[in-house]
């Protein structure tokens, strides 16, 4: 039977490898993959009200002109089917199955060896 310190060492190695692997995988994803970006998109400015003196003496309610009849739209041509895109290359430093599974395998081997 192995001494108690060997069991504690195995558990410590397991925990260290586990946290290192999970931390590496989370850091490799990066904040841009989670939609956290600096600045916002689509935030327009609010409109300003026009005062009575800004109308330049024009009639505020002009009579609407009759709408012309819409021309018939030509039939759209069928678009050719797009070619399938090749799989993108993984980014350098991105988490892969190998980079995540390796710490688990090392930790499991350490636990098995200790017991």
UniProtKB/Swiss-Prot annotation:
Xref: InterPro entries: Trypano_PARP
Location of this chain's protein in the cell: Cell membrane
Name listed for the protein in its UniProt record: Procyclic form-specific polypeptide
Sequence repeat ranges, renumbered to this chain: 59-60, 61-62, 63-64, 65-66, 67-68, 69-70, 71-72, 73-74, 75-76, 77-78, 79-80, 81-82, 83-84, 85-86, 87-88, 89-90, 91-92
Topology of the protein relative to the lipid bilayer: Lipid-anchor; GPI-anchor
Cell membrane in keyword set: yes
Domain of life assignment: Eukaryota
Keyword Cell inner membrane assigned: no
Region feature (Disordered): 27-97
Pfam families to which the protein is assigned, alphabetical: Trypan_PARP
Region (17 X 2 AA tandem repeats of [DE]-P): 59-92
Function: Major surface antigen of procyclic forms.
Main location: membrane
Chain positions listed as propeptide in the UniProt record: 94-115
Lipid attachment site numbers (GPI-anchor amidated glycine): 93
This protein's GO CC annotations: plasma membrane; side of membrane
Residues bearing glycans: 56
Signal peptide: 1-27
């Amino acid at each position: 039977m192995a001494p108690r310190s060997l069991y504690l060492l195995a558990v410590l190695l397991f925990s260290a490898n586990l946290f290192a692997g999970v931390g590496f995988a989370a850091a490799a994803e990066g904040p841009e993959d989670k939609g956290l970006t600096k600045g916002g998109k689509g935030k327009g400015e609010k409109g300003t009200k026009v005062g009575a003196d800004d109308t330049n003496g024009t009639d505020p309610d002009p009579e609407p002109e009759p709408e012309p009849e819409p021309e018939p739209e030509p039939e759209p041509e069928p678009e050719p089917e797009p070619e399938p895109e090749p799989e993108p290359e993984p980014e350098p430093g991105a988490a892969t199955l190998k980079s995540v599974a390796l710490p688990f395998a090392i930790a499991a081997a350490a636990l098995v060896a200790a017991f």
